Amino acid sequence: MLPEEILFMVFSFLDVKELIACSHACSHACSQWRRICSDKLLWVQKAELFGPESPIEQFINWRKLLCVEGSYSILTRKKIIRGIAISNSGMCKAYNYGVIFLEKYHNSYRENEVYYKPYPLFDSIKYIENILSCSYGNEDPYYFYRIDIDNRVPNENIPDIIENFIGMSKKYPFINIFAFVCTQEKIQVITPLVSGLNLTMKIFHQDRWENVSEWISEVIWKRDFMCGSTFCLKKLPSLSELSVLSRYESELVTY
């Protein structure tokens, strides 16, 4: 077995993703390697290579703030998530336009209440403009669009529909999460139109509409987790959580 000083030297040449991969391999080898992989000094060294938004640097800062109980509650107390649901048929859930629709999702971190404000697919932009331009005081902003597109929507209309909603997100940048709920036929039409866009979005088959609130809740939690600067975790994330966060980015995924 190599001396620890040499092992530290070897690990110091690895970037974060390589270090995580090596951590997985070493966890099955011996306790010495596993302990070195998880050593906070090694992660501090890696954090110095990144800017202030680095998740790894956030971990180090959070570790220094473990005694701040009130900060941790931001990640664990109930989260209100507001969004806008657009549908021409209510194919995934019967919407009553003008009535707020609520779905609850519990993950292992906190309770999430996802509120949809429903609007019809066509002529919805003017209604959305009205609510976004109003002041809501201390209410949370509208985070996301959920857009239901079934086979009754002509294919030739879909590019304009998507362009309109993407344009809204540019005007109101706090709305940058998109969940498209579609039939298989529409998935094939929409996918090439939205691929490559620098937005957080996901396409769901209409049979999996129940997963939309779960996905949105997880996205919002990861943003709170990665971007906050005044809260901390009770403990460092596990190696599997580090691996997920190292790969996490805005991407298009068909569920």
Swiss-Prot record:
Residues of the F-box domain: 1-46
SUPFAM superfamilies the UniProt entry points to: F-box domain
Gene3D superfamilies given in the database record: 1.20.1280.50
SMART domains, per database record: FBOX
Transmembrane spans: none
Cleaved signal peptide residues: none
CDD domains, A to Z: F-box_SF (cd09917)
The protein's name in its UniProt record: Putative F-box protein L126
Pfam families: F-box-like (PF12937)
InterPro entries found in the cross-reference section: F-box-like_dom_sf, F-box_dom
Source organism: Acanthamoeba polyphaga mimivirus
